[in-house]
Amino acid sequence: MRLRLLSLPFILSLCAPLLPLNTLAAERIVTIGGDVTEIAYALGAGDEIVARDSTSQQPQAAQKLPDVGYMRTLNAEGILAMKPTMLLVSELAQPSLVLTQIASSGVNVVTVPGQTTPESVAMKINAVATALHQTEKGQKLIEDYQQRLAAVNKTPLPVKVLFVMSHGGLTPMAAGQNTAADAMIRAAGGSNAMQGFSRYRPLSQEGVIASAPDLLLITTDGVKALGSSENIWKLPGMALTPAGKHKRLLVVDDMALLGFGLETPQVLAQLREKMEQMQ
């Protein structure tokens, strides 16, 4: 009987189905959305992430990666230049045509839910964990998140909170209903000082005074845009409100407040503590 020598590549090809996926080929992942990036890192995919969008500032390791731009003005060429095998992208990302172009190039485009409620974060974790084949880690992360969220007291308090959004060169805006800020204020047990409109409106002296906020909420980037925290009280009508008279101000991280990611329970606890101190 004649024996044939099998080549090493042939032997390895037979064994390939038995090897773990990550042994065969590592993914090259681009993450779009601060919440998505944060979750992907928490699930241990940091070594496979090759680029991220400008809203992805956490963890700090993400800041060292190439930035493919703002999630609502994506460019296909910039993303494809990173040679990704997978795009983990928030469903809030735009334009959708770019995502279609990327998918048609052979990239696995995974859309992550973008709902703006604290409870929706579990859905985001599940979507990312499934894409990364880390469902067990994902379940543990969901359980940890839900425990931290449940620890925040959500009993209603008689505190009216005004959230001001400020970006360099733009008129400061007040958050109305159907905004991420409104959802966070209500989730912490407060009430939105601005009523009667959805989304955002420019601040007006009459509107601010009439809303009579007890507490002013703003992000760290908002303070930078205004120059300093003291400049907040120079905004139209602000000094004449209960918040202005008592200098009641809470400054929080932008993505932690508005991104609905892993840090949501932490910023809710900050807001809740500040409101309880006012009682």
Curated annotation (Swiss-Prot):
Keywords: Ion transport, Iron, Iron transport, Periplasm, Signal, Transport. Residues 1-25 form the signal peptide. One of its GO terms (biological process) is iron ion transport. InterPro entries: ABC_Transporter_SBP (IPR050902), ABC_transptr_periplasmic_BD (IPR002491). SUPFAM superfamilies: Helical backbone' metal receptor. Residues 28-279 form the Fe/B12 periplasmic-binding domain. The keyword S-adenosyl-L-methionine does not apply. The keyword Signal applies. Its main location: periplasm. GO terms for cellular component: periplasmic space. Part of the binding-protein-dependent transport system for hemin. This is Hemin-binding periplasmic protein HmuT. It comes from Yersinia pestis.
